[in-house]
Amino acid sequence: MLPASLLRHPGLRRLMLQARTYAEAAAAPAPAAGPGQMSFTFASPTQVFFDSANVKQVDVPTLTGAFGILASHVPTLQVLRPGLVVVHTEDGTTTKYFVSSGSVTVNADSSVQLLAEEAVTLDMLDLGAARANLEKAQSELSGAADEAARAEIQIRIEANEALVKALE
């Protein structure tokens, strides 16, 4: 329950009273995958990479560790950490993406939704720039003014370490 002090704010009250509506495409149920198939949707705020595509396997980096997802995987919801998402398609091709964060949902019907805060193909990234950003962040860590600044720098370090690892 929200604290009463927040409810007195006119903007918040108006926000809480708004009716929620959905786009037709979002309200339509996802097509179920056939036996032994997995329906995969992968998107970022700026781009849709896969839209209910049948794929063989998806490898994802999560806060609890990296794992592969196949058809009939146990349902789960995981938070993504910076790292590589590897998609193995039915025709045998493999595509690698770098994600900064996000979530992955595996459903009982073998449908998988991966929503990334940021996602790019590896060919869009520069190893030299990632190394330079990593070195800069590491040098700034000791001079962090407070815990908040230190936490922000640590996040930059982790993201750039994952970038360097993905590109090497």
From Swiss-Prot:
Its main location: mitochondrion. It comes from the Eukaryota. Keywords: Acetylation, ATP synthesis, CF(1), Hydrogen ion transport, Ion transport, Membrane, Mitochondrion, Mitochondrion inner membrane, Transit peptide, Transport. The modification N6-acetyllysine is found at K136, K165. It is found in: Mitochondrion; Mitochondrion inner membrane. Component of the ATP synthase complex composed at least of ATP5F1A/subunit alpha, ATP5F1B/subunit beta, ATP5MC1/subunit c (homooctomer), MT-ATP6/subunit a, MT-ATP8/subunit 8, ATP5ME/subunit e, ATP5MF/subunit f, ATP5MG/subunit g, ATP5MK/subunit k, ATP5MJ/subunit j, ATP5F1C/subunit gamma, ATP5F1D/subunit delta, ATP5F1E/subunit epsilon, ATP5PF/subunit F6, ATP5PB/subunit b, ATP5PD/subunit d, ATP5PO/subunit OSCP. This is ATP synthase F(1) complex subunit delta, mitochondrial. It comes from Mus musculus.
